[in-house]
Regions:
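Beta-loop-alpha module in the N-terminal Rossmann-like domain of NAD(P)-dependent dehydrogenases
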Residues: 16-24, 38-45
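ALDH superfamily catalytic-core signature
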Residues: 29, 33, 40-188
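PLP-dependent aminotransferase-like
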Residues: 1-22
Length: 189
């Protein structure tokens, strides 16, 4: 989209990676600016390390993105937006919508039904497969952390509508894949 809007190729790059990848970017003389959205401890690390290396840094910590869905929302467009945001880049993107708040029970039921129907069609697989809709998490520690979040949600009383913990991709059984996972009735605490 950035290129279609007229931005020269290579000016904007989105990178998912571990500490080694982040440090490489933060220390590279070729990188002039960094923008980060994520946990507060990592945002602080990115800010301090980036500014120490004379970079312009925007680091937003503790960020979560919410979508409020009104009763007159277009169900297809809304679920497409949620799915693209939540599952694109295996959910490891700064603009992932992690919380959808539906106004009214009818709205919730329509969105929930369509969301479950559409996520069941997603093709989870390696990024090298053009047919994949979303890929694996980028390392074992993060994979285990995500599985732990799902366990915690269940233990805290959220209703698990779609459970991706036991997802296995044929030929990639040791990959860090988590299938579509959707909770309902999550308590705000």
């Amino acid at each position: 989209l950035a290129i279609e809007a007229g931005m020269p190729p290579g000016v904007l790059n989105v990178v998912n990676g571990d500490k080694e990848a982040v440090d490489t970017l933060l220390e590279s003389k070729d990188v002039q600016a960094i923008s980060f959205v994520g946990s507060t401890p990592i945002a602080e690390y990115v800010y301090h390390t980036g500014t120490k290396n004379n970079k312009r840094v925007q680091a937003l910590g503790g960020a979560k993105n919410h979508m409020v869905i009104m009763p007159d929302a277009d169900v297809n467009k809304t679920t497409d937006a949620i799915i693209g945001s939540a599952f694109g880049s295996a959910g490891e993107r700064c603009m992932a919508i992690s919380v959808a708040v539906c106004v009214g029970k009818k709205t919730k039921e329509k969105i929930k039904t369509k969301l479950l129907e559409e996520t069941a069609k997603l093709n989870v697989g390696p990024y090298t497969d053009e047919k994949s809709d979303f890929g694996p998490l980028n390392n074992k520690a993060h994979f285990e952390k995500v599985l732990g979040y799902i366990d915690t949600g269940e233990k805290e009383g959220a209703k698990l509508l779609s459970d991706g913990r036991n997802f296995k991709k044929q030929g990639y059984e040791n990959g860090y894949f988590v299938g579509p996972t959707i909770f309902d009735d999550v308590k705000p605490e």
